[in-house]
Amino acid sequence: MNKVIPELWFSAEEYQARISKIQNKINDLKLDALIVFFPESVTWATGFFTRGYSSFQFAIIPASGQSHIVCRDVEEFYIKKTTQYSSYTLWNDSDDKVSIAARAIESVLGKQSTVAIEEHAWSLSVAKYREIRNRLTGYKWQDGSDIVSDLRLIKSAAEIKYQKRAGHAAEMGMSAAIEMAIPGNSERDMAAIVCSEMIISGSDRAGPGVLSSGERAMYLHGGFNDRVFKEKDKIQLETTPHVKYYHARFMRPIMVGDATDEDFKLVESLIRIQDEALKEVKPGILATIPDSIYREALLNLGIMEKYTNKTFYSIG
């Protein structure tokens, strides 16, 4: 392989600060290492990113010293491109992946070790976890699923910068959608324009999230199809861009054609409720406080019989 020049998403100093925070937690818990399987954890801690993140890959973060990455051989370029690590183990499609993984863990941590692992990671199957444990008989295991995810909750200035860029792309996508909300255009027409505008505005992701109209606009998680907009249609749209996988998204209803006075009054009420809730969002305040403002006010408006959706969940 030709020499690859790394293109890190963040500075080397920021990555080292993240590893130091993880290692401090590892030492506080009197562990020898944390093994991270969540793709978000691997990328946040080491920088390593590939769109093939659904394959069997993880990072070993010892209590001190350099981390070690295990992944598929076709991803070696991305280790070199997105990280500064020279310590990694590769497997190929013909290999016994778990055997290679166990040997890699043992090479870093020795024959006996006390280790936390992300047991909740969707990329670590029950079968593979059992097999790893069976091969490393001198190891003691515990769940470490919250170690990195808790650290990721508070964003650095550099992370927020990416989220702001994603937020700008989200706004541009929504503005483009509003211009397309006229009779005769289709959901597919709107999706194409929204995707184009978000990419041009800086998003690394093309598609909108929810985009549905007519009857389907009243129900969550609808995707676009060839339905043609009609006068008085309601459209439900969520723009979901990301920059370096840092997300910003929002959802809005759009009406095709002219709104009535009653429609305007409802929208004004919703904006007022939103503003009242957002005023309460500040450090040290429980999410239940602004949540109750939304929940109780919307139910009191009488526009829905129940409101079970969660609010204020993290998407960073």
Where are these regions (language model features)?
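Active-site neighborhoods and metal-handling regions in enzymes and metal-associated proteins
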Residues: 1-316
